Amino acid sequence: MSRIGRKPIDIPSGVDVKIDGNVITVKGPKGTLTREIHPEMIVKIENNQIIVQRPSDERFHKALHGLTRTLIANMVEGVTKGYEKVLEVVGIGYRAQKQGKKLVLNVGYSHPVEIEEPAGITIEVPDQNRIVVKGIDKQQVGNFAANIRKVREPDPYLGKGIKYADEVLRLKEGKAGKGGKK
C-alpha cells in the first residue's frame, strides 16, 4: 500500500483543509467532512498538497499509510464532486417510489418496505425501477446502497430483486428435469 500512500493529494480551489492533531476537517462546496485518523500517521499540508507519511516501514504502518491517504483523498473528492450509487429494481410488479423523506419499495413482500433517508444522504427515484443514492461521504453512500440492496437481493435463477446498475449477475441454470423448460 505504500505506493498509494506516497502520492500527494492535491487540494482543489474552494476546498479548505484543517489538521488538528489527528482530526482532519475538509470543507468544500458540497459540505464538510471530519475524520479521526490513526495517531501514528503524520499528515502535513505543503504547497497546496496533503502529504501522508508513516513513522516506520513496519507492515502495519505500510498498510495504514495507504489507507489513511485514500480516506483523505475520498474526503476531498466527496466535498468537491460527491458520490452516487445507482440501483435497479428488477422484477414484475417490483417498484420503488419516494414519499417525502422515505423510500418505499414494493418488492414482492406482503407489505411495502419503507426506508428512512439518513442525514447526509439524498435519494432520487428518476423512474420506478431506478434508485440513485447521493452524498459526500463515500462510506455512508456505499453502506446505505448496500442496505437498500439487502431488502431483496437478486435471485440467482431469475435475477429478480434489487441490484447495482453496474452489477453483472451470473444466473444459475434451473433443474435439468425430464422434458422441462429449455
UniProtKB/Swiss-Prot annotation:
GO molecular function: rRNA binding; structural constituent of ribosome
Pfam families the UniProt entry points to: Ribosomal_L6
Alphabetic keyword roster: Ribonucleoprotein, Ribosomal protein, RNA-binding, rRNA-binding
UniProt record, GO biological process: cytoplasmic translation
Domain of life: Bacteria
GO cellular component: cytosolic large ribosomal subunit
Family assignment from sequence similarity: Belongs to the universal ribosomal protein uL6 family.
Role played: This protein binds to the 23S rRNA, and is important in its secondary structure. It is located near the subunit interface in the base of the L7/L12 stalk, and near the tRNA binding site of the peptidyltransferase center.
Subunit structure: Part of the 50S ribosomal subunit.
NCBIfam families with a match to the protein in the record: L6_bact (TIGR03654)
Protein name: Large ribosomal subunit protein uL6
Organism: Caldicellulosiruptor bescii (strain ATCC BAA-1888 / DSM 6725 / KCTC 15123 / Z-1320)
